[in-house]
Every structure is written in C-alpha cells, then in structure tokens.
C-alpha cells in the first residue's frame, strides 16, 4: 500500500485528483454488509482484499485527521466485472468469461461446489457488472473532476446492486 500512499500524497501536494481501484473483496463474505459506515468491522477473505481494505482505511484516516487531500478523490469498490477480451487474464478472468467459454466448448457449465451449509452448488451470489458500465461510472467521476465540479469524495461501490447466483448466470 506504500506506493498508493505515495501517489495520494503527491496528488495532495500538487492539488491533483486521485481515483483508485479498491475492491468489493474488502467486504469479505458480506457478513457486515456492503457499505463502509463501519469500515473497521470489515473482514476481507484474502490478501488481495486486505491490501485494498488497508488503503481504504488509510485514506479515510487522512480525511478524519484533516491531513492534505487530493483536489478530489474516490476509491472504486468494483464488484464482479466481466466483459469481452479477458483472454490475457487467464485463470483470473471473470466467472462470466470462464462460464461462457466452458459452455461454448462443452455445452455445459460446471458450477462451483458449495462448502457452506444452506447453499446448493452454484447458488453462491455475486454482483456481476459489465465492464462498460463500470467504466462509465469512472468516466463520470473523471469528467466531473475535470469540469471543476467534482463528485463527493469517498468510497463507492461499482456494481448493479443486485446479486445473482452462479447457477442463474450459467442458465441464462
């Protein structure tokens, strides 16, 4: 997170806007909801989520302590972004991408096994957001900042607001 902190500090010192990719992974299993009102209660499930979470906490501390801030700033908590041309991501490509290719090759989609009581295989929920919709949200913030009328600073969820089961994705 040190590089991100250095970028923030440079932007603050030079009155430049700072927009960064956080992640919905900061919410962990969703037990504490999907907002940042109680950010210190969030428990990411992996190192990636924690790295994003630590920087989000650090940014909010800068604000709370009235430290220098960029001219405008936002952390975008992207949910499950999918879209064309994900080939270069290999195994890190979206579930939607892998499911589509699996269906194209075999005519079926193998659903994730559930390891949680009460969830059948494939019934795990995710908020799938198309890459062009995610990009439009970021462009909105950039355009507002460039126009001199930036949006409110803070952390923003970038998703549809509706979770879908993997099974639903695979059958529709």
Residue map of PLM features:
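Catalytic helix-loop patch of NAD(P)-dependent Rossmann-fold dehydrogenases
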Residues: 2-6, 13, 17, 26-75, ...
């Amino acid at each position: 997170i040190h590089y991100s902190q250095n970028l923030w500090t440079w932007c603050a010192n030079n009155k430049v806007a700072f927009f960064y990719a956080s992640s919905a992974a900061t919410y962990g299993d969703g037990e504490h909801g999907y907002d940042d009102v109680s950010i210190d209660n969030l428990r990411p499930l992996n190192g990636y989520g924690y790295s994003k979470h630590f920087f989000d906490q650090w940014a909010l501390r800068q604000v709370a302590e009235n430290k220098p801030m960029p001219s405008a700033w936002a952390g975008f908590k992207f949910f499950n972004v999918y879209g064309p041309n994900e080939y270069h991501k290999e195994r890190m490509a979206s579930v939607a991408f892998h499911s589509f290719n699996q269906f194209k090759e075999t005519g079926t989609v193998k659903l994730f096994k559930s390891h949680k009581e009460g969830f059948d295989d494939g019934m795990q929920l995710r908020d799938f957001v198309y890459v062009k919709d995610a990009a439009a949200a970021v462009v909105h913030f950039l355009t507002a900042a460039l126009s001199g009328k930036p949006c409110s600073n803070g952390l923003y969820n970038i998703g549809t607001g509706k979770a879908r089961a993997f099974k639903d994705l695979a059958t529709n």
